[in-house]
A protein has these predicted regions:
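A structural signal for conserved, well-ordered secondary-structure elements
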Residues: 1-612
């Protein structure tokens, strides 16, 4: 790189950082397109819409309720990966969708889940909603004319596959109508016998129409018929002060990392700080561009990818130092340092990207949100480390900063004989791992739970209170939360406001009848609340057993995929097995910490485990 090119690269870098800073702070146009304030945030950060449905009929079975909760969760992920669905009482289901303020629009888009039937021309029901495994709108191309066709791709259950094969064989060249709540929404003609459990419904005029029909079919595949009971807009679960403090802490952390890199690596440290600034700006812009929903687990994914971006720079600059110490010129050391570091950086990021891809494809809820933000962060961190950092280091060299002192001097370090002390370290590891069953056993004997499961895992009690005065979320945190904690002894309390009212929703661990009465009396005494304006219902966990199963299966498959990649990459199964064993060791140590400290195990616990 010539001097003029180096100057141009540095100028463009300053311009890029300024442009990213302007975009994230202000954005473009009247709506501030691209700004950080336009990033979708979850219920914990900005609130959203809450819709409660009631099951029609008497005494729905728990199995049907669980199945309906799970399928609704999959349905509302079209709006946000961070949407929550949970059972309330015996026959109600609540859907909470973050980042939305128009409840009517969601109700219109989501529709009212009702009954779905496939009927032949005689009106006989050949399939119903329980036979549908999935439905998606898509586009295909006519093999003859080359024109686009908008279709709905149907996937049937095992029983549905058998029924549909028989129905299509008996109704060739006849219509099978799709009837939703008594209304015919489509009447496709059977063109052939369909025996593989997959079918297409053609004839839609646009992709939007195809997606709408697919949405209706998915909703109609619920086992229960539901009717809307109530809907409202709820506020954030975290106060502005908590969010502000978190942002300040994050900014301070980035600055400290930049300062540390500069102190340790000199000029390359400056490059690392600039690359980190570009990475952060690109991350915020891309969150906007891909319309991702940001929550606390999502932030954990971003923090992990920032750490990986810094790690990549450390690997590169340590290599450059080693090459200079070995007697190579600065120019040669830069070239060799990047070349030698690339394989380690790429391998480390690809294994993490494999895990993110599997978790994103198979997980749901916060696990899926974590995976998507992590995958985005990994791609950006590789780009900034291998492209931006390389350009900047070469640019600084080209403008005349060529002295070895600018690139940090390799210091003599005392070698620690880890292998020689392996018995000591193995002993420490075994003790830490044994603390897992010990800590979980003690906890289980104490309160019947191996870990301190939060609302997301165990469910609890939802108390609706209408206060006499409007209270901000910060007021609720400082005044109401301590009162609730005093009665319940629960540190894991979620409080959210209902928009345009004085109503507040308080979620705690499951409360007995006596505890509910004590809490009601405490709220009456402390805030003068009318006792008739306090209601309480039991709620299920937002992480259903099916979602937990999906997450566990996803983690296992991700682990196997990483094993296979490492085995393929290094041609030795010992490397793969060692990497996974080290990973399991770290997981067990963190699990021991959670078991002994009794820190709440919820979505943040999932994020913490996934960052390992």
């Amino acid at each position: 790189m010539k001097k003029k090119q180096g100057v141009l690269v540095l100028i463009l870098t300053v311009v890029l950082i300024g442009l990213l800073a302007f975009t994230t702070a202000v954005g473009f146009g009247p709506t501030g397109t691209g700004s950080a304030k336009n990033i979708k945030t979850g219920l914990d950060l900005s609130g959203g819409v809450s819709i409660t449905y009631q099951a029609k009929g008497d005494d729905p079975s728990q199995e049907d309720m669980d199945d309906t909760v799970y399928k609704l969760q999959k349905r509302v992920e079209d709006y946000s990966e961070e949407a929550q669905v949970y059972q309330e009482g015996d026959d109600r289901i609540t859907v909470e969708i973050p980042g939305v303020t128009d409840a009517n629009k969601i109700l219109e888009d989501l529709g009212k889940p009702g009954s779905l039937e496939f009927q032949d021309e005689s009106g006989n029901v050949v399939l119903d909603g329980s036979d549908i495994a999935g439905a998606d709108g898509g586009v295909t191309e006519d093999q003859t004319t080359g024109s686009k066709q908008y279709v709905v791709e149907l996937t049937l259950t095992k029983d549905g596959t058998t029924k549909f094969a028989e129905a299509t064989a008996a109704n060739l060249k006849k219509r099978i109508s799709i009837v939703y709540d008594g209304e015919t929404i489509s009447s496709p003609v059977v063109q052939s016998v369909i025996s593989d459990g997959k079918a297409q419904i053609s004839g839609q005029q646009s992709i939007e129409e195809a997606k709408e029909l697919a949405s209706i079919i998915r909703i109609g595949s619920l086992k229960l018929e539901l009717e809307e009971l109530r809907s409202n807009v709820v506020g954030a679960q975290l106060g502005q002060q908590a969010i502000k403090t978190s942002l300040i802490a994050g900014a301070i952390g980035l600055v400290l990392v930049g300062i540390f890199m500069i102190i340790v690596y000199a000029l390359p440290g400056v490059v690392a700080a600039l690359s980190l600034a570009i990475y952060t700006g690109l991350e915020l812009v891309m969150l906007n561009a891909f319309d991702l929903t940001l929550t606390l687990p999502g932030i954990a994914g971003i923090i992990l990818s920032i750490g990986m971006a810094v790690d990549a720079n450390v690997i590169i600059y340590a290599r450059i130092r080693e090459e200079i110490a070995a007697g190579k010129s600065v120019r040669s050391a830069i070239k060799t340092g990047f070349e030698k570091a690339m394989s380690a950086i790429v391998d480390g990021n690809i294994t993490t990207l494999i895990a993110a891809a599997v978790l994103g494809a198979m997980g749901s809820g916060s696990v899926k949100g974590f995976a998507m933000t992590l995958a985005l962060g990994i791609v950006l961190s590789m780009f900034t480390a291998l492209v931006i950092s390389r350009l900047l280091v070469n640019a600084f060299y080209a403008v005349g900063l060529r002295d070895e002192k600018f690139y940090g001097k390799q210091k003599e370090r005392k070698t620690i004989d880890f292998l020689g002390k392996r018995k000591l370290f193995f002993t420490i590891s075994v003790i830490l791992i044994l603390l897992v069953p010990v800590g979980m056993g003690v906890s289980h004997a104490k309160d019947g739970k191996a870990l301190n499961y939060s609302l997301e895992f165990m469910g609890g009690t939802s108390t609706n209170v209408t206060f006499n005065d409007d209270m901000s979320i910060d007021d609720l945190d400082s005044q109401v939360k301590p009162v609730v904690q005093e009665v319940t002894g629960d540190a894991n309390i979620q409080i959210s406001k209902v928009a345009d009212s004085n109503a507040v929703i308080i979620k705690t661990r499951s409360l007995s009848l006596d505890e509910r009465e004590e809490l009601n009396q405490k709220l009456v005494d402390s805030f003068g609340v009318d006792d008739s304006k306090i209601t309480a219902e039991s709620i299920s966990s937002t992480v259903s057993s099916e979602m937990r199963r999906d997450a566990i299966v996803a983690v296992l498959i991700a682990t196997i995929c990483m094993l296979l990649y490492i085995w393929f990459r290094f041609k030795d199964v010992r490397f793969a097995s060692s990497a996974v064993l080290a990973l399991l060791h770290d997981v067990m140590v963190v699990l021991a910490f959670y078991a002994l400290s009794r820190i709440s195990v919820g979505n943040t616990f999932i994020a913490c485990m996934l960052t390992i």
